[in-house]
A protein has these predicted regions:
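N-terminal active-site beta-alpha-beta segment that forms phosphate/nucleotide-binding
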Residues: 9-90, 94-99
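Glycine- and acidic-residue-enriched helix-capping/strand-helix junction motifs
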Residues: 1-9
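N-terminal start-of-chain detector that recognizes signal peptides
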Residues: 1-2, 21-24, 71-74, 85-87, ...
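Conserved phosphate- and dinucleotide-binding cores of soluble alpha/beta proteins
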Residues: 94-211
């Protein structure tokens, strides 16, 4: 990352934190992955039950490995050996003390956009876990809500499709086909425009993370 890009992220990050707090999110800006990991861990009480949705950003800063190694009651869907066990773990995550996730996009006015196939991730963001910790790189930030929704649909979803390898049109074309296939990963689009009692804690990272 160039020095100019770092300054750009730092300045936008400071403004976005202010705008998120105006919407009653708990928000933090960390310049590096290392700072973000330290901040995220400081928000999780020892002994908490902790689960997560699919979250490359959490993985990239080392948060998932740190939680697995820490003094927490971990609901690890990635350790499940069968699809039935995985589905059960995903349901248990909805009642976790702490739920970890990323964001597909954020708008500079402080709104968060997430797109989901199964719906477990957006469900946990809306209700269930006592707190939600969101890790998001500054590459996820767009100037306005329309651009954030567009990013979720035309950037995040097609890139995640490459990871999943499902037979959806965007896997072949690299762009959203507005599909209605059974394997569609864009069944739910969630806009979180306001947060109750700082339940959602957003850790912004001044680096490019996730998709």
């Amino acid at each position: 990352m160039t020095e100019m890009q770092k300054k750009y992220y730092d300045k936008r990050g400071a403004l976005l934190v202010k705008n998120l707090k105006n919407r009653h999110f708990d928000a933090y800006y960390c310049s590096t992955k290392e700072e973000a990991l330290e901040k995220a861990l400081s928000l999780i009480p020892v002994g908490d039950s902790v689960g997560w949705g699919g979250c490359m950003s959490c993985q990239q800063i080392g948060l998932l490995d740190a939680v697995r190694a820490g003094e927490y009651r971990v609901i690890d869907r990635d350790a499940c050996k069968t699809m039935e066990e995985r589905e059960t773990a995903m349901r248990h995550c909805l009642l976790a003390d702490t739920f970890l996730t990323g964001a597909n996009a954020l708008s500079m006015d402080g709104q968060m956009v997430n797109i989901d196939g199964n719906g477990n991730r957006v469900a946990a963001i809306v209700y269930g876990p006592k707190q939600v910790i969101v890790v998001a790189g500054m590459n996820k930030v767009e100037d306005n809500l329309d651009a954030a929704i567009n990013r979720a649909r035309t950037v995040a979803a097609p890139m995640n499709q490459q990871r999943f390898g499902l037979p959806n049109p965007c896997g072949a074309t690299g762009t959203c086909g507005d599909c209605k296939s059974e394997t569609c990963i864009c069944n739910q689009i969630l806009i979180t425009r306001h947060c109750k009692n700082a339940r959602i804690k957003i850790v912004l990272v001044g680096e490019d993370l996730g998709f």
